[in-house]
A protein has these predicted regions:
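Small-residue-biased structural context
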Residues: 2-134
């Protein structure tokens, strides 16, 4: 449960590193944004505040994916790059759907939302990103 959360929801771990400092810093910032969302949920912030934090996460993720794909394009065959881009596109589609459902009042942001964000990010960084960038 998030009530009274006093530690970050997600902490950067050395094994998250993909060996490219610029990308690692971007991943750290994404983790920071997820932690900001977790703190806002835990502290009972308004829907407006939650929407603003989620908007920031979506915007940054979109920018990060484009930047990361530039690095990957230099290393991977086109079909592997397209596969990686498809993972990014699927994530963004899911998060945009969550964002829209939240904005219309159809859902609340909760621990299940955070679990999805954390799980996807962790498995993507430790799997696809490491494979593509190392």
């Amino acid at each position: 449960m998030l009530v009274g959360m006093s530690t970050p929801y997600i902490e950067w771990q050395p094994n998250f590193s993909v060996g490219i400092e610029k990308i690692d810093k971007q991943h750290q910032h994404l983790i920071s944004l997820i932690n900001q969302l977790a703190a806002a949920i835990a502290n009972g912030h308004s829907r407006e505040t939650l929407a603003r934090v989620l908007d920031g996460l979506v915007d940054y993720a979109r920018w990060h994916f484009l930047d990361e794909e530039k690095h990957i394009a230099e290393k991977l065959e086109p079909d592997l790059l397209h596969s990686h881009q498809a993972e990014h596109d699927q994530y963004l589609a899911t998060v945009l759907s969550l964002q829209q459902d939240f904005e219309t009042g159809a859902i609340d942001l909760d621990e299940q939302t955070l679990t999805f964000l954390f799980h996807w990010m962790g498995t993507h960084i430790l799997g696809s990103d490491k494979h593509a960038l190392l």
